[in-house]
Amino acid sequence: KKINLEMVKAGFKQGLYETDTLIADQDRQELVQNFIMDLNVINSEKMMTNAKKIKGAQVFDNGIVLQTIEEGTGKNPTELDDVIVEYILTNALGDTVQSSYQMKKMSGSTEPVALALNGGVIPGWTFVVPKMKKGGKYRTYIPWQMAYGEQAGKESLCFFIELVEIGPGGTLVKPQAPMPQQGGF
């Protein structure tokens, strides 16, 4: 596609002089969101295609890819268990989005993250973590449909996961106490 320089000039003038734009704010927001979603789909498809080519990786029918980096020696959790993990989350471009290691450093904590596989994680984790063994280190590629879906812009994710501990549901992740309600009874 070619860039229409007249439209670019008009856009700069409108921005400079703070005049109305050719596209309404809501329409512009929707266009940008759709553009980002389209880019996410392209980048996600590329990441997932490459992941499926990793030698020795398991590819499941739901599109999830699991690569064993270091096999654990313990048992596998069930979908109803709680787990304690260390993890690094990257997007389809390889940028680190979140890291339990960084969160510990920033908070001064020494504890890994406790998660409930039954409702406390994305569907991809509920499926793939039970394929891991305690003590193991894994990389898993999760298609957007098994991650946060459309609400997160159709972005597929890659996780490095170290499975530290396994416990029956409710033993490692304590239920949150209900917050007191404002305004009395």
Locations of regions flagged by a protein language model:
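Cross-family detector of peptidyl-prolyl cis-trans isomerase
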Residues: K1-F185
